[in-house]
Structure formats: structure tokens, C-alpha cells
A protein has these predicted regions:
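N-terminal signal peptide c-region/cleavage motif recognized by signal peptidases
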Residues: 17-19
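Non-catalytic macromolecular-recognition regions in eukaryotic signaling proteins
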Residues: 23-193
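Bacterial N-terminal signal peptides that target proteins for export
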Residues: 1-8
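Membrane-interface capping segments at transmembrane-helix boundaries
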Residues: 214-215
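Residues at structural and domain junctions
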Residues: 8, 32, 148, 205-206
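A short, hydrophobic C-terminal helix/tail in secreted or cell-surface proteins
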Residues: 195-211
């Protein structure tokens, strides 16, 4: 199925028709987090910054706006016990497999599979799972507008955790759809963030603001 204007999945349908109202999208931020040396790389969490009361329902790529998340100067680091989305991250195994908590995966709002309604469609994850770029022009990971995990917390929504080779940078651009505080649908396309060099991967270095683009 071609991903253009509508996503169809087992949890229902998510329209991608943007409105003409002002967007609640404010930018993107990239936080470096301390992985305690439990995985061989620098770990970052990628957020969408939003106005109060807004939410993210989908991160997508289509024929007009390709999604591309990659690494400059290295590769993604993965755990053999995880998978490409937060639905594959089971916290019951963190004690036995510490690297699982810090591997690379996409999400909306949550870091584990607990109470997680995340779904995905149309994405071939094989290249990403092998450590190379995540690219799609016909896919999405998403939640429905009724799922609480899409709501902003502290003005932002987590959309991915990425561990990269020491000294490498996370680069790329994504497209999102969500709703503002009044429930009006919006899109922000080809949005990006300031790449964080691995030298900054220290606890307390956070909130690198991406460029702002409204639609």
C-alpha cells in the first residue's frame, strides 16, 4: 500500500491532511544521555518540541518528503536482544542484557513496551537494524489520537533513542503529524535538529534546538 494521504493499520486510520491553522511545532531537540558504559557508543534521545497541549501521532516519510535518520562518521549501535521500535524494548530483561536499554530504536513518547500502543507500517527495518540509515518514502510509526503517549510532556515528545559510534553524529530529517491543543491536525515536514558530535555525549548536555519550520 502506498503511503500518501492515509495510513491504514490494525488500530484504525490516521489521516495525513494538514490544516491551514498555525502549527504548534516549535522545533526539535537532541539530548545526550549517560548510558553508563552499558553499550559501546554515544546515546541520544530525539524530541519534537511543541506548544502546550499538542501531541505527535505519526512520524512518516512519503514520496514528497523522505524520512532519513543517519549517522555521520559511524553507524547505529544495536542490541541483539532488541528491535527497531520501543515495542521491542522489554524492561524485564534490562538486568540480564544491559545493552537493551540503550540500543537504537524509534518510538512515540515511551522508552519501553510497557503500556505502549505504538504501531508501524511500510518501513523496511533491515538496514537500520544492521547499523545503517533509517530511510522511508512510504512508511510510518504512529499511535492513534486517543493514545496518551503522543501528548507533549514538558513541551516535547520523544520520537527515538539512537546510540551511535563513539564520536559520530546523528543527522537527518523527519516529518510529523499531530494535533494542537484544540484537536486540530497539523503537519511539519523536512524538520531537522542540530547534529550533536560525540564529544558532547556527556550527561547534562541537552536541548540542542533544531531549526523551526511551520506548515
Amino acid at each position: 500500500m502506498k503511503i500518501t494521504s492515509v495510513f491504514a493499520g490494525s488500530v484504525g486510520m490516521l489521516a495525513l491532511a494538514a490544516t491551514a491553522s498555525a502549527s504548534p511545532y516549535l522545533g526539535m531537540s537532541l539530548d545526550a544521555v549517560d548510558n553508563g558504559g552499558n553499550i559501546a557508543g554515544d546515546t541520544y534521545r530525539l524530541y519534537v518540541d511543541l506548544e502546550s497541549g499538542a501531541r505527535v501521532d505519526a512520524v512518516f516519510g512519503n514520496s514528497s518528503n523522505t524520512l532519513n535518520i543517519g549517522v555521520d562518521g559511524g553507524s547505529f549501535i544495536q542490541s541483539a536482544f532488541g528491535g527497531p521500535t520501543s515495542q521491542d524494548i522489554n524492561p524485564n530483561f534490562f538486568g540480564m542484557v544491559p545493552s537493551l536499554q540503550w540500543e537504537s530504536f524509534v518510538t512515540i513518547g515511551l522508552l519501553t513496551n510497557v503500556d505502549n500502543a505504538l504501531n508501524n507500517i511500510g518501513i523496511d527495518w533491515a538496514v537500520f537494524e544492521a547499523g545503517d540509515s533509517l530511510i522511508t518514502d512510504n512508511g510510518s510509526w504512529f499511535v492513534t489520537p486517543n493514545d496518551a503517549q503522543g501528548a507533549e510532556v514538558g513541551g516535547r515528545v520523544l520520537i527515538g533513542q539512537f546510540t551511535v559510534s563513539y564520536g559520530a553524529s546523528l543527522i537527518g530529517s523527519v516529518n510529523i503529524q499531530g494535533k494542537d491543543a484544540d484537536g486540530v491536525t497539523f503537519q511539519a515536514t523536512n524538520i531537522s535538529w542540530v547534529p550533536a558530535p560525540g564529544a558532547l555525549a556527556l550527561l547534562g548536555v541537552a536541548g540542542l534546538a533544531g531549526r523551526r519550520r511551520r506548515r
